């Protein structure tokens, strides 16, 4: 598809959540575009080998905020349901989780499950993390978090009375879930505006810098998190 776009005279390309975020991926396509003088920018994570302007949510900061919220509620056994580790956003989320746990709960082991960004992946992660005694679970996507909620209920527990769950994205329907999901809101509008303006600047002849700009997220607290239940 990329070659087709170039052959049809596309002026520039914005890549969103593509192979540019995969640390094991083939970056040849991006190198060829640069060699051909096609302006490009990326959104949602740049692997170290990618040489292009990038724009993304500060995933490390986001996950740290989520874990800190659970710690403030009295949770100690906190788990992370994350996506494939080869992806840059997953690596950053794991780093944020590790930072928060080591600073706030240094006596607790890290409880991490790598799974898919799917409802089914969330269910699987929930079952594994509940076996480890987790009372709080941070997820790498809202869809995954909904799967975690289902997995918690499969075991006869409830959210948030027994287990608190935090999502990631703040998708449009999330406030209407049962319970309404506490989640990380990405500044999508700001990221998109910056990506487009940078691409337009390249089209006007401005030389790009191969740096990545990270945007601050917000933690939106709803009803899927509560104080840790004490027997």
Model-inferred region functions:
Residues 4-12, 21-231:
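Bacterial carbohydrate/catabolite-sensing allosteric modules
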């Amino acid at each position: 598809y990329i070659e087709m776009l170039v052959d049809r005279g596309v002026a520039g390309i914005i890549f969103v959540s593509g192979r540019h975020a995969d640390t094991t991926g083939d970056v040849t396509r991006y190198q060829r575009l640069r060699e051909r003088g096609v302006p490009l920018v990326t959104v949602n994570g740049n692997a170290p080998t990618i040489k292009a302007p990038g724009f993304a949510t500060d995933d490390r900061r986001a996950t740290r905020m989520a874990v800190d919220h659970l710690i403030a509620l009295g949770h100690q056994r906190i788990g992370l349901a994350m996506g494939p580790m080869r992806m840059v956003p997953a690596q950053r989320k794991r780093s944020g989780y590790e930072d928060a746990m080591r600073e706030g709960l240094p006596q607790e082991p890290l409880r991490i499950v790598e799974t898919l960004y799917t409802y089914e992946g969330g269910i699987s992660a929930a079952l594994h993390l509940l076996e480890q005694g987790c009372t709080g679970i941070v997820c790498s996507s809202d869809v995954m978090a909904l799967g975690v909620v289902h997995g918690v209920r499969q075991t006869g527990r409830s959210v948030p009375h027994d287990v608190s769950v935090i999502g990631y994205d703040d998708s449009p329907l999330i406030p209407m879930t049962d319970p309404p999901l506490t989640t990380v809101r990405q500044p999508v509008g700001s990221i998109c505006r910056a990506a487009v303006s940078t691409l337009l600047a390249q089209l006007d002849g401005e030389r790009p810098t191969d740096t990545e700009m990270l945007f601050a997220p917000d933690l939106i607290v709803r009803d899927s998190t509560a104080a840790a239940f004490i027997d």
